[in-house]
Amino acid sequence: SRSMQFGSAGYTKSNYASTLAATLACFLMKQGDAVGLTTFGEKLEEHIPARNRPGHLRRLLTELEKPAVPGGTSLEVPVRQLADMLTKRGLIVFISDLLAPIETLDRQLGWLGAMGHDVVLFQVMDRAEIDFIFDKAAQFLDMESGDAWFVDPDQARDGYIRKFNAHREAARSSCE
């Protein structure tokens, strides 16, 4: 999603997510597991079926190096498309900032769990988003919608952190 392109320290959330996915793929393949990769935005973009054979890791890493598809993200359609392709139960790992409506997250994760899959979520956030470390009034851009707001961080900080932490806790609860 567009929000994954944010990064306050020269490294975006998307970069971190790709590095995490590559690390998990290497680790899992070394222990003999088959690994696949699915990327999506509004719809499924790329799906590489799970395998563990020579050359497969290179294919996964090549896909992870590609820039993210511009546009928003929706869980509804891509998760259904993915579920239709999965013929065996397995471990599904989502790597995202999880800046999506909690109801959608609950519904999709619950649905995959009901199908017998184990689902793991990795939430990738930037330190500036977590601590709201901004100190000057500025224009903030919603990376998903493109809407812009002028915000005084001193006035917004407490409310933002409270809402952010509530959302993060609700996302964590979706995994239980």
Residue ranges of each PLM-predicted region?
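Short, electropositive alpha-helical surface patch
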Residues: 47-62, 176
